[in-house]
Amino acid sequence: MKIKQRPEDFVVREGYRFEPDLEGPVWVYRMDKQKVSTLQALERISKAFAVRRRDLSICGLKDKQGRTEQLVGVLGGALGDSEVLQSGDLRLKLIGRAAQPLSSRNITANRFEVTVRDLSPEEAERVPESAAEVERTGVVNYFDSQRFGFLKHGQGFIARHLLRGDWESALKAFLATPSELDRSDDAKVKTFWRDHWGEWQLRAPQAAGKRYAPILRRLREDPRDFKGAFLHIDRRLRMMALFELQSFVWNEGVKRYLGARIPAADLIGLRYQAGALVLPRSLPRELRDELWNRTFPLVAPDSRIEDQRVRDAALGALRAQGLTLEQLRVPDSPLFFKHEERPLFVRPGKLRVHPPRPDELNRGKRKVNLSFTLPPGAYATLVVRRVLWFATESARPVLRPSAPAAPAKISRPAAPRRPANEPDARATVAPQEGFLARQRARKEARAARREAARKPPGHR
């Protein structure tokens, strides 16, 4: 199974609501972007149209991969004389004005159109039945791999350094830890600062280094003020550093909770960036209705959890990371964890499976188009992988519980210590290779298939 082979294979359209105000100070544009993240798009708009970054507002962050339509608010004036503006592969169309900057309150839903490729004919035929299963059961509302960008790029959980008050390590993880997966100028900038840490009088030769100018300006003023430099990072990125750890603990707590309530035989497992997830294939109606109406906490120091089973699962996941609620504080800083309740399950709306067709990118394979809506904050990639779990190499049925695992290290997640009746998510998958090893194996397999396809019939 492959998704996002082309940008048009993964299309997201933001559903929105705002009060039009003909005299409002915020000009609202609909932005069409592809192969660029929302934060990167805002940075480009700021440069191209000479707008202060803090005067740009959005409803929510969207993934870099794929094609996205979403709103952008501009405080203080229009970007140009024309209603339609183009900046590279960004297209902006003025749709109105508003009294307030955009925020998450303005988003109503996200509509997805996803093309799943590289399916065998048998796998393609199974998709409608599996989609019907998802409609009956729903999907656990986990945070998927996109939530863990710092982890993906080898920077670990930056929040762990922050909780210890180790601002230098946190800044080094952000500014000077290049990803092995990234060949961009940004990675070269991070390599430069890894090799020249502390030599703040230097200048990275790549243009991408300009985005870190406020951080470096502070370090040139005071070379040991790592805290002040870290607080010059874009606010959204600082928040994401905290959210990654909080989201991981949420995922681990939900796994514990579901493992205590659902028989292992009814669960499947899927790997993701931070480990493995468990999802039910079927649920008794009474339990399903209960779980559909339940939330699960994103924990913070002020969390008060009434339900005993939820509390045991959430706090058990936190303890497995060597933390308590009281320790979820960043000392002497404006950064903080906030308690929130997140729906435990999500139900894709208007889920439609289109008939299989030949896949023009993968010889002899089929492609299937899926379309559905999700509420803000839910992950379409998880819905797609749940529907196509049988075609996902990282998926296996959950077979048995396992012995407790060791607590996590500082820079990467580890499997939590589990109660005896909880299934081991690692038992759901074959022995796990590293991400880079899996990428190399896929490339080698594709190369072998191409080589085999070039050989004449009957050749051995």
Where are these regions (language model features)?
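Basic Arg/Gly/Lys-rich low-complexity intrinsically disordered segments
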Residues: 4, 222, 387, 397-460
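Generic structural marker for isolated residues within well-ordered, non-membrane alpha-helices
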Residues: 42
